Amino acid sequence: MSVVKAMWDHASVDVWIYLQLIIFLSVFYFFYLFKDNIKIIYFILSLNGPPALPFLGNINYIFDKHLLFKMSHFAYQLYGPVFRIWLTIFPFVVILEPEDIQKVLGNPRHVSKGFLYNLLHNFLGKGLLTSDSETWKSHRKIIQPAFHLNVLDKFIESFNHSARKLVESFLSAGDCTNITYLVNDCVYEVLNETIIGNERQPGSKLLNSKDSPFRQGQISLFYRLSHPWLIFNYFYKKTEMGKREDKHYEALFKACKNKINETKQPNDDKNKNKKTSLLEFMVKIKSTYPEFREQDIIDECCTFMLAGQDSVGSTIAMTLFMFAKYPRWQNICVEEMNEIFGNDSRDPTLKDLRDMKNLEMFIKETMRLHPSVPLIGRVLGEDIKIGKHIIPKGCSVLIFPQSTHRLSHHYLNPHEFDPEHFNPDRSVRRHPYAYLAFSAGPRNCIGNKFALLEMKSIISKVLRHCQLELVPGKEKVVTKFRVTVRAKGGIFIKIIPRIQSHNS
């Protein structure tokens, strides 16, 4: 019996040593596996930032209707140029100073966007906006030629055609007009032709597109963040919202797939001046890049159609509102149109649009105070030094253009609307990363020239035919925070036919 007990005791010691070894190795492996995350958490805890709730972090800020105001007016003063926030259990470093932002956005090692953008895959697909760094590099190289200036020149006729329809809609809408829906219809019609390649609708009415999958769907990003278990697709796809999103993406896929099949059909049209939509361009170039799949074409079309509508539409509507609010600048820009066109009622050319310097200053100032994209995210590909801080590799960084655009040491009277901020004499002395309306660096908005030409074409057409005034009782626009910034309840303007000395 004593022999058995001795053997048992010896075995117990061996088992105990074995268990200790397993525990030690497990702990060691855990720390090895998550050493970067532990380093990040340790760094995050050393930073200043707004008070955070356990497990929820600062997610409640996302639903604060005054968030944009607080971020633009008080964040820098309260927390400085570098601080931390928590979105549920996920930490982020916020940087506001342009020279620090340049170290992130201007460095090709930091082009990865991180998990926040992954939550948009179900809605936008994996296009240039949301894709990982390697996919982005490949797609950007392939798509870039489609946005060269000589290609964009052929799209200006499409911009002008839809702009004429928008003016007709404005003039027939009455004194108090919610311009938001009409502007969105106009932008959609432009994108429907230039991105997808659908034929324009004849007549003077804007395209009725309420049933299009490109005008439907709901972005669930912030809802999922406020319900952390829904960050995981396994759980999210079992919810009603997840099922609706999947159904919506199926409709988007089908619409793009049908157009791709149509584009592949033989075409005898040899007109060299014919516009080539982005979808047609990608279908043609696919044979040169075998790694560029049909699914990639669909994802890119979804990205440009869905993201382009929100950003361009909201900016045009806000710019028109600002013209109503600042009649002196409205007169300045109308006079600029008169100098360019004289008594000629023709549509603008590329040269005309590029000559609209005052209009461009006005649009840029609108986008400075009201950027359509409220945040830019990156994941660091290596450690970087910002001020006294060494921010570790793998850390998620957020940039808030709304805050950076209102730094008093970069903009005189930063909270005041003043298009002279973009007078070339002032702009040349300003840090290039102090203005982020189209992001900046290698992963900036590929369609920024397209968007600016589209906006100038549409807005100039409106100014030449319409006098814009504020509607009593609707002199303020309340913005709401989404993936893009939108006007809550719409934007209302009084539209009066402009008296002209020439045939319009």
Language-model regions: role of each:
Residues S2-V27, W86-V93, N150-H161, L171-E193, ...:
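Cytochrome P450
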Residues I59-G80, K254, N258, D347-G387:
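Conserved cytochrome P450 K-helix E-x-x-R motif and the immediately C-terminal K′/meander segment
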Residues S2-S138, D153, E157-E168, E382, ...:
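N-terminal membrane-proximal hinge/A-helix region immediately C-terminal to the signal-anchor transmembrane segment
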Residues H110, I399-R426:
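Conserved cytochrome P450 K-helix/beta-meander segment immediately N-terminal to the heme-binding cysteine loop
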Residues L124, A307, D425-M455, V478-R482:
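Cytochrome P450 heme-thiolate "Cys pocket" and heme-binding signature region
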Residues V187, L191, Y249-C256, I285-E339, ...:
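Central I-helix of cytochrome P450 enzymes
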Residues N60, H148-N150, Y188, L225, ...:
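Conserved cytochrome P450 catalytic core segment spanning the I/J/K helices
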Residues Q201, P327-W329, N448-V485:
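Cytochrome P450 heme-binding "Cys pocket" and the immediately downstream C-terminal segment
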